[in-house]
Amino acid sequence: MIISHFQAQELLGAKKNKINEIMISLDLNLTKSKIKIQNNFFIFPDGQHLDEKQLEKIIKNDTTCFLIIDNSLLKIQLFSEQTKKFYKLVPTRDAPTIEISGIRMHVTKNFTPWEDTKRKIGSISPIRGIVLDTCMGLGYTAILSSTYADFVITCEKDENVIEVAKFNPWSKGLFENKKINMLKTDIFEEIKLFKDEMFNEIIHDPPRLSLASQLYSLEFYKQLYRVLKKDGKLYHYTGSPGSKFRKIDLAKNVDERLRKVGFKNVKKVHYGLACKK
């Protein structure tokens, strides 16, 4: 069972209004479960319980998701000695996002992560055939693409990200959906092993430029072009409209490089660019 400040506020509100039972989500907004309020305890379906102090702790940690284990709270976060990075699952009003050393991997200001992903995929609809999701993260792109595609290959090189995804109810499809093949690998190297014209669509949603400059390189774009089928479509995330990195217009530079390797009909779409081969 997972709980965040959203559910904690609901529970404390119910107690304040002297309500004895309330339906809340224990899987980060996918489903609802009945919670009983008795003798200052909040009793969960499996018999575990929390008190007001524990719920107040959750509310104070409003960028953290908590596992309920043995009537105690465990933050869904970790620090990697190998990467020297801090990873945590951050709640929203629907699907959570992942934060890596303070940087959130989804656009959360104007959209929830799930809606953000839908819009990215919608930029190159209809999705069909075999799809490449270059940078998995929590897997929302792969999961939503699998609804329409015949098969999805998704790549993630950071095992810590995969570990966080294992705790996320919204990422369940990564590990159970037979239409999704998750590769624990660096897409910069892995793409060289893919056959020519292997994919009908590609969704390239890389980390920001400062964290993965090679995924914005001409060399990598040549590989994207090579593995995409004729008339296949590419979505490339570039960031907020008008945003610049060190005074560099990233979208403009990406546009130029995509055209240089052969992509056509390059156009601005939701937080990125869409184009065809």
PLM segments and residue spans:
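N-terminal auxiliary segments of SAM/dcSAM-dependent transferases
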Residues: 1-91
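Conserved SAM-binding loop of SAM-dependent methyltransferases across substrates and taxa
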Residues: 138-150
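Class I S-adenosyl-L-methionine
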Residues: 241-277
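S-adenosyl-L-methionine
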Residues: 155-196
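Conserved class I S-adenosyl-L-methionine
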Residues: 127-138, 153
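A short glycine-rich, Lys/Arg-flanked "PGG" loop and its adjoining helix->strand segment in the class I
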Residues: 216-230
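Conserved beta-strand signature within the Rossmann-like core of class I S-adenosyl-L-methionine
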Residues: 231-239
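Conserved alpha-helix/loop element of class I SAM-dependent methyltransferases that forms part
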Residues: 111-129
